[in-house]
């Protein structure tokens, strides 16, 4: 029997789940926010961008919270919501795409970690793709593999410590920039329209800034993905909202406070990680060292979180036959051992791509970043569908009308995110998703679920994805679209 009874060691509380959400969202990119946000935008545009993004992501976060309350039977969130709402193939596709996204994302963390180490040990890890960097990055892959194999609860405890250590330098940055904040500097050219430093229209500034905020909340689904290991399913919704609110507040303060101590054109010239550059100007070398240390801790912590999430989705999909049954194997610590080894093994292989072709790797990262977005859309659409059905519980704390409005707005924002990701990337996503079709068909046959997995509706869905992939191959080969 592959599926074992749950052990208390697998149970996670609100604090552990919130730690997963925060560390999943806060990666190394947050330490570059000041420069990234102001490169072509004023303080006013940055403020508007965070407000709009915050509202949009709130609807997605609230969708996850609502679903965890009204459908507590659906574990592993984004996968089971998609399967329940739109059939086994859509569920498989979401799981497959999310899994690939996590694998490539974790290898990116390896690259960023090595590049961050280069600040302390130049030039051995420059660019994150030298031989020493590949060797140490590979070692870290298997160290994280070992930590998660020791049990999800133990790994989440390590993750909480890492999240706290990540937040400390960020909070110090906020306190220091608040100390040096001058409103007279902050309000100078608030909308970026001064002739000597014109940044274009508010619309163009907003567009460039929104593309940065677009990726800041990837990982908000963390608690939902591992909801099957939650001590109380109400903790899943609480952790999602707490993580979202905390990260949004940090993002806003981190982006806006530097406008009160340095002018926009000064901030735009600071090299990444720009938090280090800002503190170097304000307080000296120790501030730069602090931020680079924080960057290193943040990336390692986020890497651990994504390792947990990457192994959990195939495990959950295997439990009901969508992925091969071997992915459901657990070890004595109730960790998804086979899924974890397979994930780490693919990450190890992918590390070679980083060494041999950094350009190809950067392109792949842009593509896989888009692959997580359909999961937000299908989850939101599932709540729309369920809130309009007679199955919606009448005594639910969240009324059906509120759930429908929230999920509809979440769906619209998810569509915007997918559109903003770029058409060329969507076509490449279609190719990667089509690669999973043989595995889906094989799972259906092995589990003797042909009537469910391979009926006309599911075959039609597979055909649409396959045709989209063929169209993408044609357009790329004919140079009609480019990455």
Swiss-Prot record:
GO terms for molecular function: antiporter activity. The keyword Transmembrane applies. It comes from the Bacteria. Its main location: membrane. GO terms for biological process: amino acid transport. Pfam families: AA_permease_2 (PF13520). It is a multi-pass membrane protein. Keywords: Amino-acid transport, Antiport, Cell inner membrane, Cell membrane, Membrane, Transmembrane, Transmembrane helix, Transport, Virulence. The keyword Ribonucleoprotein does not apply. Catalyzes the exchange of L-arginine for agmatine. The arginine uptake by the bacterium in the macrophage may be a virulence factor against the host innate immune response. Belongs to the amino acid-polyamine-organocation (APC) superfamily. Basic amino acid/polyamine antiporter (APA) (TC 2.A.3.2) family. This is Arginine/agmatine antiporter. It comes from Chlamydia trachomatis serovar D (strain ATCC VR-885 / DSM 19411 / UW-3/Cx).
